[in-house]
Amino acid sequence: MAVPLSLGPVHHIRLTVTDVERSRAFYTELLGFQIAMDAPLPADDPHHDLTVDLLQDGIVMVNGDLLLGLRPVDTQRTNDRFDPFRCGLDHLSFSMASKADLEAAAQAFEERGVVHSEISDLPPFGIAVLPFKDPDGMALELTAPL
């Protein structure tokens, strides 16, 4: 019999991207993430090697309680693109407080030329969603209660 676990909200996510700087701009300028760490600690810091291993030439950003890491794609796979139909991530959804926040986000997307779908109400789940994609084509959405 499985032991029930009491899980909290997602702590962190790491995405593999084709261009860390392009994705950094997208996630900071459009979604409000702040840079938490974008370089290993100094060489004389006892945790230097750990941060080199953990960052993997990428960055870590924060928005509220969520940490989002970006790491570069393996250079041998430069033509690889996100595909929600392969085994792995289908999409990633970020919570917002209200449907009005989704509408404001849709307007900001329009102003910045970010392609997105219309806001859709999903009454069986009690939410509205605003689907869009990041620069690597990863399926994202903003979600708010109805």
State the predicted function of each range.
Residues 43-48, 75-81, 118:
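A short, acidic/glycine-rich surface segment
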Residues 16-67:
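Core segments of cupin and vicinal oxygen chelate
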Residues 41, 73-74, 145:
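Residue-level structural signal for beta-strand termini and adjacent loop
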Residues 1, 8-11:
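N-terminal leader/capping segments at the start of a protein or of a new domain
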Residues 2-3, 10-18, 59-62, 80-146:
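Vicinal oxygen chelate
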